[in-house]
Amino acid sequence: MSKVLAIDTSTSRTSVAIIDGDTVVFSGFRDGATAHGPSLPALVQESLAVSEVDEGVVGMGPGPFTGLRVGIAFAQSFALARQIPVRGVCSLDAIAAQINEKDFIITVDARRKEVYWARYTDGVRVGEPAVNFPADVSGASIHADLFVDLQALVRLPGNITDPIYLRRPDAIATADRP
């Protein structure tokens, strides 16, 4: 069984864990929407003091542009340097794994008074994640203010190769401005 480094920066929480089968060898997090950059290396360093890893898994969003880039770039660089595989998983799916209902919706803060969301039936995502105003998201029980379950992130199949950005970044390159 491989030891997996799990990373998620798709919410305001920077989360890191080392999972060995069903055992959580290390788990740590730091809260703060702008803390991903300084928090992630410190958490990974702390985790590696406990155990080495054979694989990486990273939450691919949806989430804020910069937060996602920090987590994904770190996971890919770490895996490349260690010559281990890394795979990407939809972060909303790893949140949904905590809910035991027939039909439900997972929402996370997208800032700008919006939410990233996805609908689930029997724990399986129905359709693609989206971004809307909270008032526009309805039709099932809504679960908000939850964070990614890193054990679920590791258990889920991961074949996502591109970050799940649901809107363009705020910054626009000078050359691309009208």
For each feature predicted by the language model, list its residue ranges.
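Short glycine-rich phosphate-binding loop at a beta-alpha junction
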Residues: 52-61, 135-143
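A short glycine/serine-rich beta->alpha loop
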Residues: 27-32, 60-64
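DPxDG-like acidic metal-binding loop motif
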Residues: 56-86
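Conserved active-site region of classical short-chain dehydrogenase/reductase
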Residues: 38-41, 72
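Oxyanion-binding and handling regions
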Residues: 1-24, 31-39, 81-178
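Phosphate/pyrophosphate-binding loops at sites that engage ATP/ADP/AMP, CoA/4′-phosphopantetheine
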Residues: 43-55
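Generic structural marker for isolated residues within well-ordered, non-membrane alpha-helices
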Residues: 44, 75, 92
